[in-house]
C-alpha cells in the first residue's frame, strides 16, 4: 500500500518543549519517478502562500492528486518533465497549515526524524511561526532555485515581504547559490524603497489574472509558469558553470544530510562541499602521495603546467559526490594554476 501524503517533503512538530524535524517521502518519491535520477538535474520552485499558492500548485501539476499536506512543505515532480534532462520539482508551503501546531507524522510518512537541539535548548517557548522561518531559511532555501511568493495570501502584501525577509536572515547562502524571487499578486505591487531581500537573487513580479468561473486554471497561471521556467533556467546556467548542478539522486542524499545538520547545529550553515566528504574522507597521507607524485614528475622531466593540471583534475574529481564524475568530463575541470 503506498504511503498516504507521499508528497510531504518535510515535517516539523513540537512535543512538549522539544521541536523535531522529520524527512517526508516527497523528495524520495519525486526522485524515484524520474527516468534516470543519477543523470537528471532537477530545478525546484517553492510556492509560498495559501489559496493562491494552492491554485498555482494544482495548475503546475495537472493530473496529480492534491491531498492536504500534513507537513511543513510538500514536493512533487512535474509529470510532463520526468524524461527531461532538467525536470521541474514543485514544492509548496501552505502558510495556513505550517503555522499551526502540528502532530508527529505517521511512521510510514517519515524516513527519519531529529530533535532540533539548538531550538529546544535556547528558546523552548518558541512560536511555530519563528520555527518555520528558521527551517525555511536554513534548510529549504539551499534546495530551491526559485521562490514564488503569493502576496495576496498574506494579511497584507508587506506581511508577505516581511516573512521572506525573516527567512532570508536565517539562510546565509553564498552569492552564487541564492534563489531568485517571483512576487505574484492580483495587481501591480509597488514597494517603497528597497525590498530588503539581500539573501536572494533577482526579483521579478507577475500579475495574476482575476479568478473567474470561465478562466481555466492553466491559462490563469500561464505567465507565472513561463516566468518560473525562465528563472530556473538562469539559476541552472549559473550552477552548471560553477559545477554545483547536482543530480536528483544526490539532492535526495544531500537533503538528508542537511536535515541532520540543521537540527543539530545552529552556528554554521549546511555545506554541500563538506557533505560530499562525510563518506569520502580526505586521507591523512594525501600530502605524502602528492610529494611522491611530484618527485616522479621531476624524475621524468614532466612540465610544471602538466603536473599541476593533472593534480587539479584529480582533486576536483575527488571532491565530487560518488556517481557524479560522468556528469563533468575531466577536461572540463582541468585548469592551470
Residue ranges with predicted function:
Residues 1-337:
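Conserved GTPase G-domain substructure that encodes guanine base recognition and part of the catalytic core
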Amino acid at each position: 500500500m503506498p504511503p498516504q501524503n507521499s508528497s510531504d517533503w518535510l515535517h516539523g512538530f513540537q512535543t512538549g518543549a522539544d521541536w523535531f524535524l522529520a524527512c517526508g517521502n516527497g523528495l524520495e518519491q519525486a526522485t524515484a519517478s524520474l527516468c534516470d535520477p543519477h543523470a537528471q538535474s532537477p530545478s525546484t520552485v517553492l510556492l509560498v502562500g495559501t489559496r493562491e499558492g494552492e491554485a498555482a500548485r494544482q495548475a503546475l501539476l495537472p493530473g496529480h492528486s492534491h491531498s492536504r499536506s500534513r507537513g511543513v512543505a510538500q514536493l512533487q515532480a512535474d509529470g510532463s518533465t520526468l524524461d527531461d534532462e532538467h525536470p521541474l520539482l514543485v514544492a509548496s508551503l501552505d502558510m495556513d497549515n505550517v503555522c499551526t501546531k502540528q502532530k508527529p507524522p505517521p511512521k510510514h510518512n517519515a524516513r527519519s526524524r531529529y530533535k532540533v537541539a539548538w531550538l529546544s535548548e535556547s528558546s523552548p517557548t518558541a512560536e511555530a511561526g519563528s520555527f518555520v522561518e528558521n527551517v525555511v531559511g536554513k534548510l529549504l532555501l539551499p534546495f530551491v532555485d526559485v521562490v514564488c511568493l503569493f502576496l495576496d495570501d498574506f494579511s497584507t502584501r508587506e506581511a508577505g515581504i516581511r516573512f521572506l525577509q525573516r527567512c532570508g536572515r536565517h539562510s546565509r547562502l553564498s552569492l552564487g547559490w541564492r534563489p531568485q524571487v517571483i512576487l505574484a499578486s492580483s495587481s501591480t505591487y509597488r514597494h517603497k524603497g528597497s525590498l530588503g531581500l539581500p539573501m536572494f537573487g533577482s526579483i521579478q513580479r507577475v500579475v495574476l489574472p482575476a479568478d473567474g468561473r470561465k478562466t481555466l486554471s492553466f491559462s490563469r497561471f500561464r505567465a507565472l509558469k513561463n516566468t518560473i521556467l525562465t528563472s530556473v533556467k538562469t539559476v541552472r546556467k549559473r550552477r552548471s558553470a560553477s559545477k554545483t548542478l547536482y543530480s536528483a539522486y544526490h539532492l535526495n542524499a544531500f537533503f538528508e544530510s542537511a536535515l541532520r545538520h540543521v537540527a543539530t547545529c545552529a552556528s554554521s550553515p549546511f555545506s554541500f562541499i563538506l557533505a560530499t566528504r562525510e563518506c569520502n574522507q580526505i586521507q591523512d597521507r594525501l600530502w605524502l602521495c602528492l610529494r611522491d607524485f611530484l618527485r616522479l614528475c621531476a624524475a621524468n622531466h614532466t612540465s610544471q603546467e602538466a603536473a599541476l593540471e593533472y593534480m587539479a583534475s584529480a582533486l576536483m574529481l575527488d571532491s565530487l559526490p560518488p556517481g557524479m564524475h560522468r556528469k563533468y568530463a575531466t577536461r572540463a575541470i582541468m585548469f592551470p594554476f
